[in-house]
Every structure is written in C-alpha cells, then in structure tokens.
Amino acid sequence: MLVAARTHDYGKQPIDSLAGLLKSEGIDAAQLVLPKGFTEIGSYDEVTPEIIERIRANFEKEGIKIHILGCYMDLGNPDDDVRKQAVDTFKKCLAFNKTLGASIVGSETAYPRLNDEEKKIWHPYMMDSIARLVEEAERLDVDMAVEPVYWHPLKDLETAAMVFEKMNSSHLKMIFDPANVLEHPEIDQD
C-alpha cells in the first residue's frame, strides 16, 4: 500500500525541500499542484523546464512518486479568453508531465459554484476544452483526468459517463472524490 498526500496541505515549500519533507512524514506518493506546492512558483507562467527537472530530480531522489499533477483550471468558462488561458495552461502541464512522469494531469471543470442553468450554459464550453486537451494528451502520449464536482458543469457520474463516451480516448481518466458529487457533503449520509 502507498500512502499519498496532497502536497499543498503542507503549505508552500522550497523545491529542494518538499520531497524530503514528504518522505520524513512517511508519504510515498503525491498530488502536486505546482503554484500551490512551491515557494519558488507563484503561477504556471513562472514554470520553466529547469524548474520541472529540479522537481523531478528531488522527488526521484527521495523515492516519492507524483501520481497526480494537479492543474485545476476553469475549463468550462464561457469567456473565451479565460478558457483559452485555462486550456493553454493545462497543455503546458501535459508537456511538463513528460518529464515529471505523473500518472495523470488532473483538473476540475470550473472555479465558481454554478446553479443548474449556469451548468447547462457552461457544458458545451467544457466539452470543447476537454476535447482539445484529450487531443493534446493523445499527441504527447500522456494521461489526463477530469474530476466531477456537483457545482461544476461536470456535475455527476452520469455527465462524466457521457463525456467519456463522447471523447472515446484511453488517455482520458477520472479522479473521483465521492464527497464532490454531493450537493451538501457536510450532511451525515447515514
């Protein structure tokens, strides 16, 4: 069994220290979100191939597997500029993953909490973004994943199944946190 952690739960750490900290805590694998994980990275625009290589080398040295490279973007946003930036950033992370070797690059499909009408409006934009990203993942031969969240256009497992059927790609995976598809996850489910 591997013990994994979200690296940003440890706060932002120096690139040369994070993997060692995880190892000292008994962590074997990680979900890594670059701007949330490292003091040297304020945004994806600051990430260079040299930084990616430093991260890879430090995690490899400590024996920590990067299972998920998180790149949480607003993939369904109807604003063309916002969505283009989101897709371009996710594509960068797909390319970074060739070096980092994470199992998947993952994202939710929106930032804000959307009502049912907004989810319907955002849905075709989300589909367009996912199609572009699947094409890039296939080109690079890496895997990507989307995560259903009740408040987002990818709101439930039925919608996820429809997306997977439409995309029909072995490079598209799913991150599933059951609490994220509940309208009120704080309610006792017993």
Per-segment meaning from a language model:
Residues T7-P14:
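Short polar catalytic/cofactor-binding loops
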Residues D16-K36, L100-G101:
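Catalytic domains of carbohydrate-active enzymes, especially glycoside hydrolases
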Residues V3-T7, D28-L32, I66-C71, V105-S107, ...:
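Hydrophobic faces of well-ordered beta-strands that scaffold small-molecule active sites
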Residues P185-D190:
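Glycoside hydrolase catalytic-domain groove-lining segments
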Residues D16-G20, E53-R54, N58-E62, L75-F176, ...:
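Active-site acidic/histidine proton-transfer and metal-coordination neighborhood
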Residues M1-V3, F59:
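N-terminal amphipathic alpha-helix/helix-capping segment at the start of soluble metabolic enzymes
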Residues D9, P35, Y72, A110, ...:
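Residue-level "edge-of-site" marker
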Residues Q31-R56, T109-E117:
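Glycine-rich, proline-tolerant flexible connector loops at the mouths of alpha/beta enzymes
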